[in-house]
Amino acid sequence: RMAEEIIGYLNKKLFDPSKPAFFGCEDFLRRDESTRTDEFFTIIDECIYCDANAAAIVTYLDAARILHRADLRTQALGVLEFIWDRCRSADEGMYHCFDEGPRAPGLLIDQARMGMALVQAFHATGKAVFLERAKELAKIIVLRLANSKGGYFDRGQSELAFFGAP
């Protein structure tokens, strides 16, 4: 029951079916900061974040299987296609966010989370295209984010300018 309630909240408050994708978050703010009343209002962050949507895709695909709800699978795959089509560059991989357009390409978290969502979509559908896309992102991680001393950088050189670095 709790899973159904969480899905209901996400779909009612954070899902935009016209895209289709999930908004960033809902913030709760006190109506009057000078008093300690319980009155508050909410603001929806309508920016679409790749990593958060990828996590939602994985969760909805799991929920579809566990709850026997094909509609959740369809919704997850729709979000996956939107994020892949609108938040990706062939050279730089996944962009971190999308509002008026895609912004902040090449962050490790976005490549990794979207890669996991694509692998999960492959398991849910058997469609090889999802596995091929995950491999594309893995190549970007290795080529653009690998540290020659070991491990990976969380962002590439070209992405640092977005964050104000030289």
Question: Where would I find each of the regions flagged by the language model?
Answer:
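Glycan-recognition and catalytic cores of secretory/periplasmic carbohydrate-active enzymes
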Residues: R1-P166
